[in-house]
Amino acid sequence: MLFPFPNSPSKPRRVVITGAGIVTALGSGWRVNAVGFREGRQAFRPVTLFDVSRQRVKIAAEVDLPAELPPTKLPARRVARLDRATKMLLLAAHEAWSQSGWQADANIPLVLGTTGGAMSLGENYLTHAIRSPQSQRLQATRVVNYQPQRQALDVCDAFGFSGPITTIANACASGANAIGHAWELVRHGRATRVLTGGHDSLCQLIFAGFDSLQALSPSPCRPFDAQRTGLTLGEGAAILTLETLEHAQQRGAIILGEIIGYAAATDIHHLTQPHPEGNAAFATMTGACKIAGITPNQVDYVNAHGTATPHNDSTEAVAINRWAGTRVATLPVSSTKACVGHTLGAAGAVEAVVSLMTLREQWLPPEPGLVVLDPACGFPIVRERTDACVRVVVSNSFGFGGANATIVMRRWM
């Protein structure tokens, strides 16, 4: 169940974060998002990106993209043709890159998580193919753009590096899996630094699909509420720059935090429903903490996956209760999806950046909208703006098909 990553032939290296970028419906950039998450602001509104007149649900967390993107190596003509997800990805990557102080270097690996090219690539391909099936002139462009790694290639070209690309499409755990894989590359000496994160954009196909599954809530989602009615979709991107502690210290970098544990597991129970006992979720939390060398008693906050669907939240509650043991009654937990919705492949990365914010700025993100706590939760939910001493954070990401991942982060002192 729990995947045992191979041990390095030498002592594992410490991996630190030196840059972070984030784009959500709260805004673009660390500061606006930190303020929004700290205050528990909700960014839901009626959908304007596509027609939802035939859908049961009409709201989502849409991103307001700026009129211009930051300067890159991409020619203006190519920038004009970029899809929505790539634009968000470039904004987040530019912020992380600028903050890190990294200099141009061709040999930097890129590891990204997304749900099949942010889903929008497939939708665009099929839409245009149906509308103009005989247009051979456009067929080559369609095929080239219909690739899950298309957005990763755009990032490489934008920043001028040609390191190896890895694109992970593992449902809603994709962003966390990407960061975990990047962490393993650096930790075990396969890379000195890696650019990593996740991204996804809203699209009509996925919106209609979730609505047909009766998984969407007609009102803003309420994770862990006893009367929750489903998730609310969002979109966004988040990027981290990871490097060895030694490399960061040698160049005098500002260290934002440290990743000290990661684990991934699959329960193979059902296509859309998690295992009722939360076995894989329990395994990832236990495994990640074991690798980190900590116990639940040393964890100060859990950023839950918390989608607000009946099955997911109940299962995650069971898993957290099992994992935390006697610590559970006083362990602060919240789901930031109550603010920006479920960003799918970007979720694990977005929530990793939010977790980093709590470590850097010493507050816990409240969960707006909660009315009655589900009795399955043995832990308290953060409901209002809270200052706290945060040293270690656990961030969970769980996806369809039983894909589970947990990241453990520590404050840098």
PLM regions and their residue ranges:
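Condensing-enzyme catalytic core mediating Claisen C-C bond formation in acyl metabolism
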Residues: 14-18, 41-46, 220-292, 298-301
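Glycine-/small-residue-rich "gating" segment that lines the acyl/pantetheine channel
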Residues: 133-139, 180, 184, 201-250, ...
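Conserved small-residue
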Residues: 19, 37, 93, 110, ...
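Acyl-CoA/ACP chain-elongation machinery
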Residues: 190-212, 217-229, 262-276, 306-313, ...
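ACP-dependent fatty acid/polyketide chain-elongation machinery
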Residues: 1-78, 100, 246-258, 353-368, ...
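Active-site-proximal alpha-helical scaffold in enzymes
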Residues: 89-99, 148-151, 156-159, 164-197, ...
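Active-site nucleophile and cofactor-binding loops and adjacent substrate-binding regions
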Residues: 51-52, 81-86, 140-148, 166-174, ...
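Conserved beta-ketoacyl condensing-enzyme motif
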Residues: 17, 41-170, 199-207, 296-312
